[in-house]
Design a protein with these regions (language model features):
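N-terminal cap/lid segment of alpha/beta-hydrolase-fold proteins
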Residues: 1-40
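Short loop/turn motifs at secondary-structure junctions
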Residues: 38, 64, 102-104
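Catalytic nucleophile-loop/oxyanion-hole region of alpha/beta-hydrolase
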Residues: 73-107
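Structural motif
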Residues: 40-41, 107
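Conserved alpha/beta-hydrolase
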Residues: 60-77
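Conserved HGGG/HGGXW glycine-rich cap/lid loop of the alpha/beta-hydrolase fold
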Residues: 41, 51-53, 58-62
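Active-site glycine-rich loops that stabilize anionic/oxyanionic intermediates
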Residues: 35, 39, 45-51
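Gly/Ala-rich beta-loop-alpha elbow adjacent to hydrolase catalytic centers
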Residues: 108-112
Length: 112
């Protein structure tokens, strides 16, 4: 049995109506230790790559942290990429961690 679990997270971006790519939801995988709600979680995202199964997620969850491998609405649709909208999408992931997952501290993980 694994010491971590993965939950699918999918939410609409707040700026979806203002962008031609906006109909795609933000989505990702939230990794947590089994039987424990983390107080600290990390979020990692890439403008076009799929981070929902990020290689660091299981190791960090086993050590007691939450990890949200987050995909903006531009995953696989780089041609429509707008930085301002991607930042809003990242903010949606941070809000989900604080409001839905109950995390106290969110760490933005740079990875590129």
């Amino acid at each position: 049995m694994s010491a971590w679990k993965r939950e699918f997270v999918g939410i609409a971006s707040p700026t979806a109506p203002r962008n031609v790519i906006g109909f795609h939801p933000c989505q990702g995988g939230y990794f947590t230790p089994v039987g424990k709600r983390p107080r600290v979680a990390m979020i990692a995202a890439h403008y076009g790559a799929d981070f929902s199964e990020h290689y660091l997620a299981p190791s960090l969850a086993e050590r007691g942290y939450g990890f949200l491998g987050w995909n903006t609405r531009f995953r696989g649709a780089e041609v429509g990429f707008l930085l301002e909208h991607a930042l809003v999408d990242l903010g949606a992931g941070v809000s989900w961690l604080r409001e839905q997952a109950g995390v106290d501290t969110v760490v933005l993980l740079g990875n590129s």
